[in-house]
Amino acid sequence: MIADELTYRIRGAFGFPPTAEQEHAISVFTTFMADRHEHAVMILRGSAGTGKTTLAAAIVRAMLSCQQQLVLLAPTGRAAKVFSLYAGTAAYTIHRRIYRQKSLEGGFELGYNNAHDTLFLVDEASMVSLNGEGRSLLDDLISFVYNGRNCRLMLIGDHAQLPPVGEEESPALMSSVLSSYGLKVHESTLSEVLRQSQESGILYNATQVRWLMYDGRCELPKIHLQGFTDVKIVPGDELIETLASSYSKVGLDETMVVTRSNKRANIFNQGIRNQILWREEELCTGDQLMIVKNNYYWIKPPATHSSAGNVAGSSPQQGESEGVSFIANGDMAVVRRVRNIHELYGFRFAEVTMTFPDYDDYELTATVLLDTLTSEAPALTRDQQEQLFTKVMEDYADIPRKSDRMKALKEDRYYNALQVKFAYAATCHKAQGGQWAHIYVDQGYMTDDMLSTDYLHWLYTAFTRATEQLYLVNWPKTQIEEAED
């Protein structure tokens, strides 16, 4: 592929002249694609409002016009859906593309990359972790891609967002980390906020937070309201009315409250269900749920999981709706039917039919554990998990062989019940990768001694989840920039 031809096609896919930074990124990309090094990789960093999304979409369109095979990936289902919408072609979650089910013992292992001459593009790469028990997601992603013949990887992300839990920075966006894998790194960073983005109060204030972060100034940012209609302060006594208005205007699925803790998210979820949606039952039709623990039991994936047949621009043999191989932590679901609520083993369960909006409304009926809905813990605690294990195993005490008892346990619907929470409010890590029309940010009580770079990452990530309207809940006056006379 001739670099000049590719440059011409990318520029043409823009529809308007690229900025100087975008031109440089295009040059880096064409050099990356022309590099004969078999382990070349590219990092494209860009903060909100810098045109990263526009550039990535132009690259996808240009590559497809050249008949180049692509696989678009993202860390979560909602992030994959967003990537698919702006790129104009199918995108998949990383986990569902690179792992396959073990045939006998259950669980998943790294799959085989059948693709060749394929570019893998990963959006929201700031969420890809290096930590983990044994091999990390970044380890497996790199191994999977470069095990394919003449395949290469492009990582796209915003390094101002929250890094993965337990990390100080986002490892997938660090050239030093990628170089340690023996990869030849090409990189480009977009930092200039585009003129049209400066008209957005959401992006203006997110950029102010980003500047504080990179200037090394840990101070409470002042929110600028003057001249913007898309950022508003919501006092506590107006929150119910304002949230109800958002639900009426854009819907439950386009409104999200972002909080700093599971405890706060739980309080908001209960308040929203009781005082706005008037839902008195434990779980109702129409309730929005979030899966809080990976579950491999309820979906039986296909025996083979080839990436070669799932390139962008083709008709995938398995789209996310047809090839959902497991239910992932962070997946969103909508309750369609609730029946047979009952107590067993000291826990409460229900049979729930639900659809998954980020996977073309894939429908599933499963046993759901109700106890996690309102608990302050992220999922079942270790003690609760051990209690459930012990109680279920008692039912199989008549099976003489331990291996057969363990097999029965793995096939037990109660031990494998879905762990869920309500999804009207969530922590920032849970919301990361997704976008909603209306975002409500609850930072809780803040003092100067609570300031840190982590807080600024959190605030920036929370702000940039909003696409239309940002509401700041109970925001202190000391954090609001006074209007100029």
Residue ranges and their predicted role:
Residues 27, 31, 36-219, 224-226:
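ASCE P-loop NTPase helicase motor core
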Residues 18, 72, 257:
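Conserved SAM-binding loop
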Residues 2-40:
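Conserved pre-motif I regulatory segment
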Residues 5-6, 25, 29-30, 37, ...:
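Conserved helicase motor core of P-loop NTPases
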Residues 88, 272-275, 456-460:
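Short, solvent-exposed amphipathic alpha-helical segments in soluble enzyme
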Residues 22, 76, 261, 433:
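Short, conserved phosphate/pyrophosphate- and ester-handling motifs at nucleotide-, phospho-/glycolipid
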